[in-house]
């Protein structure tokens, strides 16, 4: 599921990281939450409960309830085990007095009917997919959507097989327990969630037919790119999903496979993490900073949280990924943002794979300090370039094309594991026009390429007060060029 560790070089690399963490503390307070003594807390999911309690699930099948995670003094946190004996839940939410979990073999509803603080009713909502014991057969589940459906993405068997029913598919579980096959083409999810509009996205990891890890839109009826599980269309009398051409390019295959929805945002391998995981939408109304309607995406290998700004162009999602939060104690898997209070909760585990954080597991709280960093807030595609929106007025440097540079590339769409960066280009930034309020800049660019990742560096840009960008890079996946 996840890739091998990338080590940070000694010397100057450590100095750069230390400087970045110091800057991060000015904007975001990251605090470890004490864990229960003796508990092996490799967290797989987080659910927010009434009365500011939090439920977490573990790799080994336990459910714990945390009290006090919102308090200023985290040393007073208490824990109570709510359930045990489950099968690696990777999705949890609270609704109408019940805790819903997505386990490897099923979606389950847990209830505490006698009020003693532990679950005594375990009800199977749906178990319509297969498992065979392979370690890779994860099942990630969403909270309920607007219609009450739970979306479940099913990992393949191993890296490239589909030995159990519906592996490599996304299913919707309806409130009355029916299972609806919804999308094919999935490989190795790391998380699933909604954007502010209620559309569903998941993260998929690098591997066969995935040149690099990415964030993907689960449009009903779509093909997500990996054909390994396509054989299961016969189980529901569905039309046979498309057969891609090995060694092609996604932009080429889209022309002949209309069901193929491209990755919304590609995370270039090692540059923007290696194992994207949980997804949290910011609909907090500014309680977590100026990122309203954007997504936060966990990163297991690099122990980070990235920030994603999406847009739709010609009906297709695309957008930019930015570096955001770093320095977590272990590899981040689940994320949950409390949109009422502005607290971001992150769970971590090395899970047998290495992570930069170094610890075997962690549970952490992140709070915005109220100080806004100077950042590129959004990056939006234009017919002949991009528009950047800043979090505060920029200085004159933002109107100088020399303050920016760009390169672009794509990946081989192939059955082999991953892909190098190929078809490289160097788009030329010919003009940079600041808006009257200096909070945005229009970059005119020669050489935009449909289907390429466009990597922007804005290292010469400073704010009106002379502050450099906290993160001066963005990676934009240009699936469509606006007309």
Regions found by a protein language model. Give the residues of each.
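Intrinsically disordered, low-complexity Ser/Thr/Gly-rich stretches
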Residues: 400-437
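Beta-propeller domains with acidic blade repeats across secreted/periplasmic ectodomains
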Residues: 23-373, 379-385, 396
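Bacterial N-terminal signal peptides
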Residues: 9-19
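Generic structural detector for well-ordered beta-strands
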Residues: 34, 81, 389, 405, ...
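N-terminal secretory signal peptides that target proteins for export/translocation
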Residues: 1-6
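Acidic, Ser/Thr/Gly/Pro-rich low-complexity segments and short DxT(G/T)-type signature motifs
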Residues: 369-378, 395, 411-412, 421, ...
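A structural signal for the main folded, soluble domain(s) of proteins
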Residues: 251-259, 418, 457, 468, ...
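Extracytoplasmic/surface-exposed domains of secreted proteins
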Residues: 384-408, 436-471
